[in-house]
């Protein structure tokens, strides 16, 4: 540990018990990693070692709370009697006035949410088609179109509701508890039942669930506010001092009166401001609306061409309206929103089963395209559990003596144990001597960590009655304690300091240990190195992330040396710098463009504060990257909201969860990478369906448009409607398909998407034209297939077969046989194919005019031939770099970009200096 980082508390800073976990664990909590030792052995060990002290602690807890006068505050919130608390009638009255103690969620009106499934460019076109059918008194088409619109809305609404139900169940498992005094009795309640004026009982390990004030006189609490303010050290709280929701009590016991709940708390107000800053339509919705708008324009262009041809042929108005209805139905895919929503909702439910709560469905698309993941270190890359290394002892001191002394300088209360105490107690399994001796010592007085002296002190009595003072803490501060008592031999002093420097350079935190036996001088004993080791799966996950084209940047509040050592162990890059080099505090002399280059090239930053996280995300986004950000505290909320995908990690505060797009209940980076793979699979399903559905619309627009213009013939309107229905019904099962995941981030490459869809649509149109002209000749018995039946049924079957089979082409990254479709998708397509064949054979829409089996078999053969041609075409275009260049062109480089970056950073620095000057 470096000199300036040589604080005992630095070892606690990112330790697992810094902020005690909620008393109620999620019902679906992820299983611990194989090499992570559970804390159950700690409880058993404490029971064995400190049974008398634990009993005394329990007796203390049973005492009635001490009364104390509250400090005057506005209204009557602090006038509650501290012994009796509120009455139930007062609780009900205040709950009606102030509501539940929870941040308000934007509750959507179910009816309005359902109605919104009828809003959008695609839906408007279908509604226009329904009105047109009603005007033509074509009640069959009118009913079918309305049913199609209703099916789209019902499927989308039900799927989102089911996914939301799963998320709500998981959220319930995260509920906190609160110990409240009401009507003179102590009750344990759900935290959301707390109201202003309630008296809460605080104990070591309590997570404070509302804002309030300490009301116990002469009390000394230490509260961890790192989730709110980012302060690494616990804050001292005395009578009258404010407390904030999401803080954790580290030391002491007392009472507080609740002054604010829910959205009125500091956390709630911060979350409200962050959420208010977010607005606008999601990127995915913009993509769908853009596709619908372009298809609508194509429909209008097709109708213009048809109307122009009809003008010269003097076509009747009623016939023109039929043309309009047909082209409108086939030109805009009404099922597109429903299928895509279903795909994302099913994916969200699957992610929820893997402990990832998707707050909004569009986050799935964003996560699939993430190129850079800015990850915190503690708990995500590491275990968030301290482990001890090999002790360094000075001459004449054994490792057993050092461990025994360090364990004596530990809390005797189970809830008072910090991460360092737990680490030492776990280490006793490897030190049987100190373990057997520990119970023979009696602790006379224990002084918790003092941020001034940076050490923990315990006064104990040995079995022979000798009194010993034991300390552990920041190595150089422990050394100072000994030096103030007597000079230390030069060789011991040199070896001790060298070891401190060596451990710091290797990324270890270190603790100095010393003791003073009654009647003797202080004795320096040695150093115990400790570290937060990487999770067992992190190195493998980092390697997998690289394979997936994802860059992981470490952003940590730890010292740079610690961050570098962790990065080295994980196989990450070691270009990790102090966040101060970003120059956000008004300093720094790098031009803005160089700051952008610096952030882009860095593998991470140490000694990071929330403003650094926000700046890193902003810079990467301005460079064109899609960025994901992990966080857990209130101060992380702006960064989580700023990122393209905000990720609240396990144990995150309500504010962080509210600001995030995805909330993870399972610890570690592997859960995030697994979710990323799943999101890419979901994106692939959506992308393949959109290509498929646009191609179908273009296919029918091209074929029927030319057929109307050249031949002045129109397919039966009922069959046109059923073609549209079959195209969407068959592919609803795409949500359950065995989709591959891309090995690189995926985005909506719209030029390429439209290029592929257009070419495939043209191939389909040519295939349909050839089938029609070769199988159906002018006059009886002049076609290739004799006794073929009715033209509409032949066209209907060929169009249905080739369109349904297209999904097997677009769903694969390689040849169509390279990936086996799911049984749901295969079954749905087969069922629709059989139904379409029955339509053709029995002529259900042409008064029973049947088509021969021979003709039907020939149609299947023609359709399979067309399928092979479009499969080959799609594969060639998908693998062609030239096609991509033709669709996207060369990337344009902005000459002014670096100048703009220089200006932005200069303005930020000037603003910061100005604020400092005003202060």
UniProtKB/Swiss-Prot annotation:
A single GO cellular-component term from the record reads: Golgi apparatus
Renumbered to this chain, the Acidic residues biased-composition regions fall at 34-63
Positions that bind Mg(2+): 632, 636
In this protein, the active site sits at: 376 (4-aspartylphosphate intermediate)
Report the SMART domains cross-referenced here: Cation_ATPase_N
Reaction(s) catalysed by this chain's protein: ATP + H2O + H(+)(in) = ADP + phosphate + 2 H(+)(out)
Instruction: State whether keyword Magnesium applies.
Output: yes
Q: Which residues lie on this side of the membrane: Cytoplasmic?
A: 1-113, 159-289, 346-717, 773-824, 876-919
Q: Where is this region: Disordered?
A: 1-73
Keyword check for Nucleotide-binding: yes
Pfam families under this entry?
Answer: Cation_ATPase_N, E1-E2_ATPase, Hydrolase
Q: Which GO terms describe its biological process?
A: proton export across plasma membrane; proton transmembrane transport; regulation of intracellular pH
Q: From the Swiss-Prot or TrEMBL record, state where the protein is found.
A: Cell membrane
Carrying Phosphoserine, the residues are 89, 494, 899
Q: For this protein, what is the EC number? A: 7.1.2.1
**Basic and acidic residues bias locations:** 1-16
InterPro entries attached here? ATPase_P-typ_cation-transptr_N, ATPase_P-typ_cyto_dom_N, ATPase_P-typ_P_site, ATPase_P-typ_TM_dom_sf, ATPase_P-typ_transduc_dom_A_sf, HAD-like_sf, HAD_sf, P-type_ATPase_IIIA
Q: Which UniProt keywords apply?
A: ATP-binding, Cell membrane, Hydrogen ion transport, Ion transport, Magnesium, Membrane, Metal-binding, Nucleotide-binding, Phosphoprotein, Translocase, Transmembrane, Transmembrane helix, Transport
GO molecular function terms here?
Answer: ATP binding; ATP hydrolysis activity; metal ion binding; P-type proton-exporting transporter activity; proton binding
Regions of this protein lying in the Extracellular compartment: 135-138, 312-322, 737-752, 846-858
- What membrane topology does the UniProt entry give? Multi-pass membrane protein
Ranges annotated as spanning the membrane = 114-134, 139-158, 290-311, 323-345, 718-736, 753-772, 825-845, 859-875
Q: What does this protein do?
A: The plasma membrane ATPase of plants and fungi is a hydrogen ion pump. The proton gradient it generates drives the active transport of nutrients by H(+)-symport. The resulting external acidification and/or internal alkinization may mediate growth responses.
Q: Which family does it belong to?
A: Belongs to the cation transport ATPase (P-type) (TC 3.A.3) family. Type IIIA subfamily.
Q: What is this protein called?
A: Plasma membrane ATPase 1
Species of provenance? Schizosaccharomyces pombe (strain 972 / ATCC 24843)
Q: By which gene is this protein encoded?
A: pma1
